[in-house]
Amino acid sequence: MDWGIFSYVIIGLTSGIGAGFFGMGGGTIIVPVMLTLGYSFEHAIGISVMQMMFSSTFGSIINYKKKLLNISDGIYAGIGGLIGASFSGLILSVIDTKKLTILFLIITFYSFVKYAFNIKYSTNAAPPIKSQFYQRLILILTGIITGIFAISLGIGGGLLMVPILGYYLGYESKRVVPLGLFFVIFSSISGTISFQNHNVIDAQVLHTGIYIGVASILGVWLGIKLIQISSPKLHRMALLSVYGLSMLVTAYNLITS
């Protein structure tokens, strides 16, 4: 096997384990690593989004079999994701790379603080949206908003979807997380097409994304197995270490670029 392909397989396995073990978007691992390997921020995002197609599909199949996924909700959120992510190529082609990298760093830092201090979103006991029509509309709008920002930064949608759906629809996080993973299937496909249409990514990036994506499927499976045998304390320390390392590597690449 070519050493380049071998390294991509290792990256895919690692990001997949992160997704299965921590429930985090692969971008937290993939983007800093690809920046370190000399890829541009746009190409790193493109590779991260392509990887999401594979890991989110595999993860959603598992969630569906475990009856954790509401397909109806997922389709409406997915429609929004298709629409929102279609703008991601335009965003990456017009916004300065350094600004996007800083925003990625801020979001990673927020995630670190959230888990370090065990900050949890409260579910609205009396959600303002009761009508089924408006509930579906909220799902679509949430998908659009999340698709625009999350795919443009190569991150999962849970960080944005959990507080929005928790407030307006009263959804608990354990219901939103599988929904967010299913949403990523739609938004990542739309985002990849948008990246291609705006010449953000090329054939080499597509091939790299496929290698990493296929390897991430095995990584997700391994991550799920690992979480079953690890203690909560070890899981928490490992999660914070990954976020901390991601911030350090991203900040280093930002300063030296």
Predicted regions: what they are:
Residues 14-28, 170:
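Single transmembrane alpha-helix segments in multi-pass membrane proteins
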Residues 16, 45-53, 82, 177-188, ...:
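Transmembrane helix-bundle signature of multi-pass membrane transporters/permeases
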Residues 20, 33, 43-46, 164:
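Residue-level recognition of specific faces of alpha-helices
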Residues 22-30, 154-164:
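Transmembrane helix boundary and interhelical junction motifs in multipass membrane proteins
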Residues 27, 31, 47-50, 54, ...:
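Alpha-helical transmembrane segments of polytopic integral membrane proteins
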Residues 169, 186-197:
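Alpha-helix capping/termination and helix-coil
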